[in-house]
Amino acid sequence: MRVADSIMKKSIGLVGDTGRMGVLLTQALLCRPHCFLGKGFSRRSQTSLEEVVTENDILIDFSSPEVTSLLLDFLLKTPRPVIIGTTGFTNDSGVKTKLSALSEYVPVVVCANTSLGAYVQKRLAAFAAKLFSTSYDVRILETHHRAKADAISGTAISLAEAIRSAKAESYEEEPEPFIEMHGSRLGNVCGEHEVSFVGEDERFVIRHEVFSRRVFSGGVLLILEKIMGEGLPKGYYTSDVLYESLFQEKVFG
């Protein structure tokens, strides 16, 4: 039996349903046979966040840090599986604490970037970080559309964390590497990330460029299918963790 055939139809609530990602996800979900669009929320909608939580089976959030924080307050009262695609949280916002608390009851998937290419780039960057000595300088450049609020992007921060972790594992005695990071907001660029390892005699570059936001909605649908089809246990997940299981199946399965 195919996964899709074994899934009971679920109601999906989109938070941020009139935004760039919300519109794409609305179009994509309308074509999925095993789920249907329930009530959604945007700043202009007449539906309350509480209604969206109580009247849907699964929530997908691409809104703003402020709205996400309020959404989590309602989810802690009425737990539902949730995919969080919003970025730009500050350390003192309390969102991380709320996510951790919610994950005690339901699966919580936090994804700064749902593109498979972004996951592969991070894997390659971590691998390269282990090979290139600390004498190599590291730089991350990211570019997004002018309306994106957070800079540096969540994806760039995640890349830096992966590189630092890999360096710490391979060069324990060396100080934590300095990673130069730059962000640009230009036009309607969907997303570009470039990681450079620069030595005295060479430069190694890993670049990922997104041409269409459809790649992000496709990644969200993969995550959604994993939640619905495999009965993902309660816990805190990232898109990397779920892609890692897919990677293991493709390469070693």
Swiss-Prot record:
NAD(+) binds at residues 16-21, 85-87, 111-114. GO terms for biological process: diaminopimelate biosynthetic process; lysine biosynthetic process via diaminopimelate. The active site is at 144 (proton donor/acceptor), 148 (proton donor). NADP(+) binds at residue 44. Its main location: cytoplasm. (S)-2,3,4,5-tetrahydrodipicolinate binds at residues 145, 154-155. Keywords: Amino-acid biosynthesis, Cytoplasm, Diaminopimelate biosynthesis, Lysine biosynthesis, NAD, NADP, Oxidoreductase. It is found in: Cytoplasm. One of its GO terms (molecular function) is NAD binding. It catalyses: (S)-2,3,4,5-tetrahydrodipicolinate + NAD(+) + H2O = (2S,4S)-4-hydroxy-2,3,4,5-tetrahydrodipicolinate + NADH + H(+); (S)-2,3,4,5-tetrahydrodipicolinate + NADP(+) + H2O = (2S,4S)-4-hydroxy-2,3,4,5-tetrahydrodipicolinate + NADPH + H(+). PROSITE patterns: DAPB. GO terms for cellular component: cytosol. It is an enzyme of class 1 (oxidoreductase). Pathway: Amino-acid biosynthesis; L-lysine biosynthesis via DAP pathway; (S)-tetrahydrodipicolinate from L-aspartate: step 4/4. Catalyzes the conversion of 4-hydroxy-tetrahydrodipicolinate (HTPA) to tetrahydrodipicolinate. NCBIfam families: dapB. This is 4-hydroxy-tetrahydrodipicolinate reductase. It comes from Chlamydia trachomatis serovar A (strain ATCC VR-571B / DSM 19440 / HAR-13). The gene is dapB.
